[in-house]
């Protein structure tokens, strides 16, 4: 045992989570959304599952789940990055056994943070989430993808 860790913890480093994309965009369908920073009025995420990606888009009246196929995270990020959107590329965080109870409104930010296992107690808006993930205090690295330089066509899987 070294420095309070068990030997098996040192021999087996923690596994990385599935690849993930986090998309920030400007939606102003609601008067409340117009009060948020332009370009950061809504967010949704995609999580890789084999050759497919599960899109989780938390909307006002429902959570929309869609399955898409893409060759890799970079190609999918380029497809999603268009004017008015910012795409972050990263990975799903480790699931923690014990979580503090969250008494917060169930917004797009809260849904995305739960899907991606992001712990950020004071984050309530899409822009705050963006800053948190790119800030130095974030536990893992996320990177920005710029506007699409190439067009990639995604085939929808299933019905």
Stretches found by the model and what they are:
Residues 1-30, 34-35:
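GIY-YIG nuclease catalytic motif and its immediate N-terminal context
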Residues 16-19, 48, 113-118:
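Solvent-exposed, well-ordered amphipathic alpha-helical segments
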Residues 63, 68-111:
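Aromatic/basic micro-patches that form nucleic-acid/chromatin recognition or nuclease catalytic surfaces
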Residues 21-78:
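Glycine-rich catalytic cores of cysteine/serine-nucleophile enzymes that process amide/ester linkages
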Residues 8, 98-159:
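Activation targets extended, charge/polar-rich intrinsically disordered C-terminal tails
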Residues 17-20, 51-53, 85-90:
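Short amphipathic alpha-helical segments, especially helix-boundary/capping motifs
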């Amino acid at each position: 045992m070294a420095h309070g860790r068990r030997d098996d913890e040192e021999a087996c480093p923690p596994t990385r989570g599935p690849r993930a994309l986090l998309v920030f965009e400007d939606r102003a369908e609601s008067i409340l959304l117009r009060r948020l920073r332009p370009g950061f009025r809504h967010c949704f995420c995609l999580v890789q599952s084999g050759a497919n990606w599960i899109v989780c888009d938390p909307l006002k009246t429902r959570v929309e789940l869609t399955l898409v196929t893409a060759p890799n995270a970079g190609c999918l990020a380029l497809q999603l990055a268009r004017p008015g959107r910012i795409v972050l590329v990263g990975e799903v965080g480790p699931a923690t056994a014990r979580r503090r109870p969250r008494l917060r409104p169930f917004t797009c930010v809260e849904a995305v943070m739960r899907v991606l296992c992001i712990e950020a107690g004071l984050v309530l808006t899409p822009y705050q989430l963006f800053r948190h993930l790119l800030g130095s205090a974030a536990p893992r690295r996320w990177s920005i993808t710029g506007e699409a330089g190439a067009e990639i066509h995604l085939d929808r899987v299933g019905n």
